[in-house]
A protein has these predicted regions:
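Surface-exposed cleft-lining segments at the edges of enzyme active sites
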Residues: 50-51, 125-132, 156-164
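Nuclease-adjacent, charged terminal/linker segments that flank catalytic cores
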Residues: 1-87, 265-270
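Conserved catalytic cores of phosphodiester-cleaving nucleases, focusing on short active-site segments
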Residues: 69, 141-160
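Charge-enriched interaction surfaces
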Residues: 17-20, 36-39, 61-65, 79-98, ...
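Active-site metal-binding core of divalent-cation-utilizing nuclease and nuclease-like domains
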Residues: 81-148
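Domain-level recognition of nuclease-like catalytic cores that cleave nucleotide substrates
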Residues: 163, 189-270
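Extended alpha-helical scaffold and adjacent linker segments that couple domains
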Residues: 5, 9, 130-133, 194-198
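Mg2+/Mn2+-dependent nuclease catalytic core
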Residues: 159-183
Length: 270
């Protein structure tokens, strides 16, 4: 069982490893040019470097999720065992899946209910598939865990999504569930979108500014924000703050100071 100290240690070491990989790649990055190099040369180079770090950090959230889940007793599966090997879906099942998507969008069913209806359709029609394929680009998962007979699968996204993305993300959830139920019709599935942190001062502000983008998805069930996600994986309250405390400690480390100097040097390079 995890506690505050173990969550902190896992977050610290997982993030440190990610920073080491990013630092190693910094010196090998291919320098590019655009018009802002003329207008704001140093700032543009710093932005480019930091943007690469933000992109790299996406893999850190995934690794941290796996590390915490594993330490808290979840069985973990490689995401590519799913993304590169799903059953081919028949046209009638695709049509039924889309029917459930439309019913969800008109709020006639919840996502959980839609998944249960897809399960019933597969079982009643005795559907199976021997053909395999890769998940379509952009529709794969970032994590796949199991605990107490329930599979948790999902994607980790930016907490600031575009307007209307809720419908697209909800469709992804139905796609993932359909693939798993074709392979294991009796599997209990919790398919979610995870946002690793709240960029605003509090939850209420987040929901007022971002929540409408995900309608009719429901927070806490269909998408998980910050502690809703990390506490689910770790079993420890206030996990997001603990994770960011680890980041704060890393910000004062020799490694970060070295990276800051590397960024400064690269931004001056011509």
């Amino acid at each position: 069982m995890l506690n505050e100290d173990s969550v902190y240690e896992i977050a610290f070491h997982s993030t440190k490893q990610n920073l080491v990989r990013w630092e190693d790649n910094l010196s090998n990055r291919e320098q590019t040019f655009n018009h802002f190099d003329v207008l704001f040369p140093n700032a543009r180079q710093i932005h480019s470097i930091v943007q690469s770090g933000l992109t790299s950090f996406g893999s850190n959230w995934e690794k941290l999720a796996y590390d915490l889940a594993s330490a808290n007793g979840y069985k973990t599966f490689e995401k590519n065992d799913f993304n590169k090997n799903v059953p081919v879906i028949s046209e009638d099942l695709k049509e039924f899946q889309q029917k459930m998507r439309r019913k969800f969008e008109t709020e006639d069913v919840t996502l959980d209910k839609a998944i249960d209806e897809i399960r019933k359709f597969i079982i009643q029609n005795k559907l199976s598939s021997t053909e395999r394929k890769k998940v379509e680009s952009g529709k794969g998962i970032d994590f796949w865990f199991e605990k107490d007979g329930v599979e948790l699968i999902g994607d980790i996204k930016s907490p600031q999504e575009n307007i209307g993305n809720g419908k697209k993300l909800a469709e992804h959830i139905l796609i993932w569930a359909t693939y798993r139920l074709m392979d294991e019709p009796m599997t209990e599935i919790e398919a979610v979108i995870a946002f690793p942190y709240n960029p605003y001062a509090d939850f209420e502000t987040y929901m007022s500014l971002q929540g409408q983008k995900f309608a009719p998805m429901k927070t806490g069930t269909d998408y998980l924000i910050a502690d809703q996600f990390w506490e689910k994986l770790s079993g420890v309250a206030n996990s997001t703050k603990i994770i960011f405390d680890a980041f704060e400690a890393l910000s004062q480390s020799e490694q970060i100071l070295r990276i800051k100097q590397t960024i400064a040097d690269l931004s001056q390079a011509k």
